[in-house]
């Protein structure tokens, strides 16, 4: 809330600076700016709009402090941050190891798209990290974690994964959209890259799309080069809206946590449902969540114990306060039957 205040413009909110061209007074000035950018690539020195403006720079400063990272790159979508992370590290002939229950577009990217570029993906069981270590080879360049896993809500032993990666000198990335750095700070924990879909809790109002990729110092240059090549940069209008949303992130997530706990308590008492959420204290999921997170967000899974698919539709269609649609983390309550979610 108190990061990157704009005393120059004397406005409590940063102005939206839209620019394709950055104007300079002289050739010396543009060369001077380019020299500053080379010496300090995180300092907000731009010579062209594709690199960003002061509006996107302010958001990056706020997120860098929130993540406690070396730097944060912002992308047009959350999945753009996933792509940038993987594209920055992998090359033809490499291998990556990915958590099995990942977000379906991430699986599509790693399982099918990367295969066309001779990049092999091996999926590991989050409940059996021996399968992770067993599949490491000399070609393994990245371990990609999603915590908790989409659909299954498996919480993994992050410390153990980092230990395996460190022992084998492999880079690590985690999709931390569920927890956000408000509840978990992956870079501080030891991850090289931390991904958050800013479309969700960062924005909080279901009116903008964006992504963030926080990085450690040792992978910064690789990601920096990849970002400049791909042009994966968030626009100033979206950056402004996400910055505005971040002002209330703590208040909103605290309320999400309280409401989710009430819903989880209610659902856990019904034998017709299997709750996928870190609620039962005697479960492995709860222990892994408690070990690394300071809180829980509002997204949960629910299995209806019935072989009749119509019972699922009947349940979802009978909800009065929940809309039916994709995404989450906004102001509205949503429900979705995951069977129909193939691509994002």
What are these regions (language model features)?
Residues 26, 30, 37-44, 51-52, ...:
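Active-site C-terminal subdomain of aminotransferase-like
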Residues 17-23, 28:
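C-terminal substrate-binding/catalytic lobe of Rossmann-fold NAD(P)-dependent oxidoreductases
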Residues 10, 186-187, 291-292:
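Short glycine-biased active-site loop of nucleotidyltransferases that positions the nucleotide triphosphate
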Residues 4, 71-270:
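Conserved PLP-enzyme active-site core in the AAT-like
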Residues 1-17:
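Short conserved active-site loop signatures built around small residues
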Residues 24, 128-133, 283-284:
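A short acidic, often aromatic-flanked loop/helix-cap motif at beta-alpha or helix-coil junctions
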Residues 26-80, 111-112:
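Conserved N-terminal alpha-helix of the aminotransferase class I/II PLP-enzyme fold
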Residues 111-112, 120-122, 134, 138, ...:
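PLP-dependent enzyme catalytic core of the Aspartate aminotransferase-like
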